[in-house]
Amino acid sequence: MAKTIKITQTRSSIGRLPKHKATLLGLGLRRINHTVEREDTPAVRGMVNAISYMVKVEE
């Protein structure tokens, strides 16, 4: 089974760059305190790094 990470949105997407909003939607995050589980891949890690100020990651 592939390793997964939990990603939680901690800040609002209102007033953010359009690319950052698109990244949130790409990860499946829709609202504050929404948590999703994603596979720990370089692509997902890159998306999380781009919006690290808006999300919390748990291994």
Curated annotation (Swiss-Prot):
<comment type="similarity">
    <text>Belongs to the universal ribosomal protein uL30 family.</text>
</comment>
<dbReference type="InterPro" id="IPR018038">
    <property type="entry name" value="Ribosomal_uL30_CS"/>
</dbReference>
<dbReference type="InterPro" id="IPR016082">
    <property type="entry name" value="Ribosomal_uL30_ferredoxin-like"/>
</dbReference>
<dbReference type="Pfam" id="PF00327">
    <property type="entry name" value="Ribosomal_L30"/>
</dbReference>
<keyword id="KW-0689">Ribosomal protein</keyword>
<dbReference type="InterPro" id="IPR036919">
    <property type="entry name" value="Ribo_uL30_ferredoxin-like_sf"/>
</dbReference>
<dbReference type="GO" id="GO:0003735">
    <property type="term" value="F:structural constituent of ribosome"/>
</dbReference>
<keyword id="KW-0687">Ribonucleoprotein</keyword>
<comment type="subunit">
    <text>Part of the 50S ribosomal subunit.</text>
</comment>
<dbReference type="GO" id="GO:0022625">
    <property type="term" value="C:cytosolic large ribosomal subunit"/>
</dbReference>
<dbReference type="GO" id="GO:0006412">
    <property type="term" value="P:translation"/>
</dbReference>
<protein>
    <recommendedName>
        <fullName>Large ribosomal subunit protein uL30</fullName>
    </recommendedName>
</protein>
<dbReference type="InterPro" id="IPR005996">
    <property type="entry name" value="Ribosomal_uL30_bac-type"/>
</dbReference>
